[in-house]
UniProtKB/Swiss-Prot annotation:
The gene is cysG. The modification Phosphoserine is found at S128. The keyword Cytoplasm does not apply. The lineage of its organism: Bacteria, Pseudomonadati, Pseudomonadota, Gammaproteobacteria, Enterobacterales. Pfam families: CysG_dimeriser, NAD_binding_7, Sirohm_synth_M, TP_methylase. It comes from Salmonella dublin (strain CT_02021853). This is Siroheme synthase.
Length: 457
């Protein structure tokens, strides 16, 4: 380990920055946020420094570097564009045993500045030891996406409860189990983010009153249409907190690779070599695992409330009194149309869009008369096997035979394939496509040649 990561308490302590440009301004902003009593020494200053000085936030000393300014300092930063001056600052700080950072010259510095993820009072620092600042920045950006913005509020509230937790729970094991339950409670986190004091208090009292081995919960998460980059941040957070993930075949391998490594995985989909797990059995798996006290994620392709049978699964949990929540996902209609260059609505061609299941209950019938109406876009889910029937019915109820159609196979993924034609060809086109696939019918399909972008990548 080349550097010891430490967090410095600088509130009301003297610090010095030498330099008055943009780089110095960025460093000054960090020190001011930390509450430092800041002096800035430079020949010239960008306007922001004058603003801060006029507001009494820092002191400006105009002129060449004055090393006596270091005499009362705890920490210094050299941020000029003159290497000679920066080295003088470093040497003067070293002689006084004051830690000094030299911007873009880690070998001349006694400390380096990390990339920071600020969820105060929770702080995360990332450093490459000065060898690769860009890598440190990329890691910081990834961590920023993983850590909820309200995490700091949760940490601050936890600090307020420490004495009560210590008093109520006698052993370290009990306290640990309580805090694990506390920090994964989405209702509490959301209530804190919304400043809903009544809900915060109610959830807190429930956490303290529940036995530590209480039943778990189920989170219904939409995985999106395929591209792992379309998984929501909240969805990513949930699958990385799960004890067990129950998933179907529409969830891509790229997304499953993001699941917490030691989480159990239960496949309940239908694909070659596997039998389809009946819906009732899936419901019982969710119920059984939650009753063991586990955090269960039910991971579904697309959005769980759009032809995902999510409502049926939650009804079972609701009846059993199991806590649950839902994280929406980008539905296949949105993802596949966007990645195919087909806008679902358009001022000239479609004022509405209909999402339709092509997989009906026995004896079921769609409202073909309204589906055949003009100025709308139809998106059929699970419609490949019924493509010929869809073609026949729409034409029979008055839709023009030359209406553009498109079938999107493996939408949003690197395997995406789009075939298109007109309505009279729909049944034939469906023979060229494999599931999972989506059928889009409407004049907007004609814009594909102009708006297609994904196939160019």
């Amino acid at each position: 380990m080349d550097h010891l990561p430490i967090f410095c308490q600088l509130r009301d302590r003297d610090c010095l920055i030498v330099g008055g440009g943009d780089v110095a301004e960025r460093k000054a902003r960090l020190l001011l946020e930390a509450g430092a009593r800041l002096t800035v020494n430079a020949l010239t200053f960008i306007p922001q420094f004058t603003v801060w000085a006029n507001e009494g936030m820092l002191t400006l000393v105009k002129g060449p570097f004055d090393e006596t300014l270091l005499d009362s300092c705890w920490l210094a930063i050299a941020a000029t564009d003159d290497d000679t001056v920066n080295q003088r600052v470093s040497d003067a700080a070293e002689s006084r045993r004051i830690f000094c950072n030299v911007v873009d010259a880690p070998k001349a510095a006694s400390f380096i500045m990390p990339s920071i993820i600020d969820r105060s009072p929770l702080m995360v620092a990332v450093s490459s030891g000065g060898t690769s600042p860009v890598l440190a920045r990329l890691l910081r950006e990834k961590l920023e996406s993983l850590l909820p913005q309200h995490l700091g509020q949760v940490a601050r509230y936890a600090g307020q409860l420490r004495a009560r937790v210590k008093k109520q729970f006698a052993t370290m094991g009990e306290r640990r189990r309580f805090w694990e339950k506390f920090f994964v409670n989405d209702r509490l986190a959301q209530s804190l983010a919304n400043a809903d004091e009544k809900a915060v208090n109610a959830t807190t009292e429930r956490l303290f009153s529940e036995p530590l081995d209480h039943r778990g919960e189920v989170v219904l998460v939409g995985a999106g249409p395929g591209d792992a980059g379309l998984l929501t941040l909240k969805g990513l957070q949930q699958i990385q907190q799960a004890d067990i993930v129950v998933y179907d075949r529409l969830v891509s391998d790229d997304i499953m690779n993001l699941v917490r490594r030691d989480a159990d995985r239960v496949f309940v989909g239908k694909r070659a070599g596997y039998h389809c797990v009946p819906q009732e059995e899936i419901n019982q798996i969710l119920l059984r695992e939650a009753q063991k006290g586990k955090r269960v994620v039910r991971l579904k392709g697309g959005d769980p409330f759009i032809f995902g049978r999510g409502g049926e699964e939650l009804e079972t949990l609701c009846h059993a009194g199991i806590p649950f929540s839902v994280v929406p996902g980008i539905t296949a209609a949105s993802g596949c149309s966007a990645y195919s260059g087909i806008p679902l609505t358009h001022r000239d061609y479609a004022q509405s869009v209909r999402l339709v299941t092509g997989h009906l209950k026995t004896g079921g019938e769609l409202d073909w008369e309204n589906l055949a109406a003009e100025k709308q876009t139809l998106v059929f889910y699970m419609g490949l096997n019924q493509a010929a029937t869809i073609q026949e019915k729409l034409i029979a109820f008055g839709m023009q035979a030359d209406m553009p159609v498109a079938l999107v196979e493996n939408g949003t993924s690197v395997k995406q394939r789009v075939v298109h034609g007109v309505l009279t060809q729909l049944g034939e086109l469906a023979q060229q496509v494999e599931s999972p696939a989506l059928i889009i019918v409407g004049r907007v399909v004609g814009l594909r040649d102009k708006l297609n972008w994904f196939s160019n990548y």
